[in-house]
């Protein structure tokens, strides 16, 4: 089964300094049909104006992933990290027993565009941690997150994998799905056809009870593929 979550059907909140689209229920957007998918709890598509950002705030027992599409994030947290995360890089933070952090757009002229993704951990009370790494190949499937941090990926405390998949126009490829696993695909840019379902920039696809994904790039495209545990 494939369910297409159209970009324009997501929750939307424009605060002036922040324009945010919510794939799943978040803040003032609530839809009981969209509370998450497997271990995914939040996929927010955020544009943050120059010089603006999220002030220091707490988190606990959540894996928080940021993928920067345009601009740079300035990250600061209660572990003593103060980092710049430019476009093309992923940042993972395990909130665990508790962490406080801020995320700002340090530019005075350029907007910041990013995905903020929350993943429920397998267990609560883990030690907080922070990592960032660049994954920006022009073509191919790169492993970004995995439980064992293999092949240069970032570690995530959940039985899941995340791939960043860049495809050139007319490229056709297949991704096998293990029994009972669930897959979420987020289209970062471009136009793709997945098992006959067409999807475009910012669309999402929930996939279950399928043995494989056949993906065709109708234009140069990039998707995030989450291989997730059974519910």
UniProtKB/Swiss-Prot annotation:
Any one Gene Ontology molecular-function term assigned to this protein's record: quercetin 2,3-dioxygenase activity
Domains (record comment): Is composed of two structurally similar domains arranged face to face.
Cofactors that this protein relies on: Zn(2+); Co(2+); Fe(2+)
Free-text cofactor note: Binds 1 divalent metal cation, Zn(2+), Co(2+) or Fe(2+).
Family the UniProt entry places it in: Belongs to the pirin family.
Keywords: Copper, Dioxygenase, Iron, Metal-binding, Oxidoreductase, Zinc
Keyword hit for Zinc: yes
PANTHER family tied to this protein: QUERCETIN 2,3-DIOXYGENASE (PTHR43212:SF3)
Catalytic activity: quercetin + O2 = 2-(3,4-dihydroxybenzoyloxy)-4,6-dihydroxybenzoate + CO
EC supergroup of this enzyme: oxidoreductase
Function: Has quercetin 2,3-dioxygenase activity in vitro. Its physiological role is unknown; however, may provide a mechanism that would avoid inhibition of key cellular proteins, such as DNA gyrase, by quercetin.
InterPro entries per the UniProt record, alphabetical: Pirin, Pirin_N_dom, Quercetinase_C, RmlC-like_jellyroll, RmlC_Cupin_sf
Regulation of this protein's activity per its record: Inhibited by kojic acid, sodium diethyldithiocarbamate and 1,10-phenanthroline monohydrochloride.
Region forming the signal peptide: none
Metal-binding listed as a keyword: yes
Binding-site residues, a divalent metal cation: 57, 59, 101, 103
Pfam family, one: Pirin_C_2
Coiled coil: none
Protein name: Quercetin 2,3-dioxygenase
Any further remark recorded for this protein: Quercetin is a flavonoid compound synthesized by a variety of plants, including foods for human consumption.
Pathway the protein takes part in: Flavonoid metabolism; quercetin degradation
EC number per UniProt: 1.13.11.24
